[in-house]
Amino acid sequence: MSLANNHARDFGEAGRLATMNTLREAGIHHSGLEGDFATMEVNGLMVAVLAYAVTRNSNMMLDYDLARDTVSDYADTHNIVIVSFHGGAEGRDRTRLPFAEEVYYGEPRGDVVRFSRMMVDAGADLVIGHGPHVIRAAENYRDRLIAYSLGNFATYYGISVEGIKGIAPILVVTLDSEGHFVNGTVHSTIQILSLIHI
């Protein structure tokens, strides 16, 4: 599970540590804190999950060279490398990829195409993006799947899920043992905000 996002510290460092402890107790691997990468064995293959964001105390997406070198190192020792990133500008008008550095309210949010392709070139087998709160394009780049944004999935009260911001695709991907994209299925879902009155 990726903890690399701008809401991971909504409840301070104590909340973030509590989340990490809860995930660990449940046997769920996590990545995202600076220097925190998940590794596991799946069906006899060593898999690494490296999560990046543009926020402090995270593995920094904006340091393209360090991210590239880290992915390359993990690709040397793991069969499959999955990269997750939280980047790109936000909003219902951000569905199209700008192929350039993005900024949101003055905060640099990265060039998601450059970052993603650089990670594949360094050895990543699957790259999954999130952050813009809307779905974005996916591409098969060098036989590796890049999904630039899967939109909103489990959103709490206060975040709009109206219209395009409520679309939340679930992506199921099959890779071969070398990390090549074999096939995938998109399960379409729509979030509906419901309030529970206590």
Task: Give, region by region, the residue ranges found by the protein language model.
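Acidic, metal/ion-coordinating pockets
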Residues: 1-196
